[in-house]
Amino acid sequence: QLSIGASAAELPDLVIIDSPDHASYAAMGIFADISDKVSDWDGIDQYYEGPLNSCKLDDKLYGLPFGSNCLALFYNEDMLADAGCEAPTTWDELKDVAQKTTQGNVTGFAMCCLQNEEGTFNFTPWLWSTGATSYDINNDNGIKALTLVKDLVDAGSMSKEVINWTQGDVMNQFISGNIAMMVNGPWQVPTMREQAPDLNWDVTLLPKDAEYASCLGGENFGVIDGDNVDAALDFLQFATSKDEVASYIDDFGYIAARKDVAEGQFTDDETMQKFTEEMQYAQPRGPHAQWPEISDALSLAVNESITGTSTPADAAAKAQSTI
């Protein structure tokens, strides 16, 4: 709709946009550069780095974060205890725990590996944990991340069906007792509590290779480059103030992109607090004007590594040629 509106010169003054798409539309000239206009706003220094960077292109700011989420590791406490395991903190521990909890009809681990943006969302934390970037995958670190996913499938610790599973499908497998650990986000927590009230589970940081990493999800405010930029900014300054964000952010199921608000969220909810902790390691997808093409290349590399269409090394080289 935003593209159609731009073509017809019929755009609103302010939009809410999925964070990985922000840079693409900024590159089209749809959004105004507000860098200088908001630099002295109260609380502008309170934003987490990841969410704020998702509003940027070439170091220029084209909006502000609305609300954020990220990915973490969910685990079935009973299954891990029965296998004599604790929640993994490293890749080696992840592979070990996944193998030990793979028994009968239960596989140890699952994550969405669809060949689309959802799959990329779930793969990038493993890529970034090695120190690699989304733009440079044809190296030892990029191949290592693809190999991790392939090894989990080859060991039987993760079903090959993950190439067909959405994040919702993964959650359903988890609450049905078919998997011991999964990658997922905070938006699943209310559903899990409602549909599986007797299931014993917890959340922890995604296991790391060289460093902790997670992928940022959420939405941003984008200011349209039109006649009403100043009016849009007046509203944005109000809507993104500390007190206003605190008044509505929980209703949207988001973690606040402002640290001074996020730190006061979920004070009685240890599970959601884990996601707030994970936010400090969450990175945006991009920001890059050609992110959709980059994302397609990354998710294809994961798919080909899992299915055996390509080796991780060949899949990385193919992805790099597109990127």
Question: What residues fall within each predicted segment?
Answer:
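A structural signal for short loop-to-beta-strand junctions that line the ligand-binding cleft
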Residues: 4-5, 12-13, 41-79, 107-108, ...
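Extracytoplasmic "Venus flytrap"/periplasmic binding protein-like
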Residues: 1-47, 78-89, 180-181, 191, ...
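Conserved C-terminal helix/tail region of periplasmic/extracytoplasmic solute-binding proteins
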Residues: 81, 154, 277-323
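Long, aromatic- and glycine/proline-rich binding clefts that accommodate carbohydrate-like moieties
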Residues: 197, 201, 249-297, 304
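Extracytoplasmic/periplasmic substrate-recognition and gating elements
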Residues: 82-83, 147, 154-157, 188, ...
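Periplasmic solute-binding protein
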Residues: 20-30, 50-87, 112-134, 215-222, ...
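Hinge/lid segment of periplasmic solute-binding proteins
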Residues: 18-70, 95, 101, 119-122, ...
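Glycine-centered hinge/linker elements that transmit conformational signals in sensory
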Residues: 97-102, 135-163
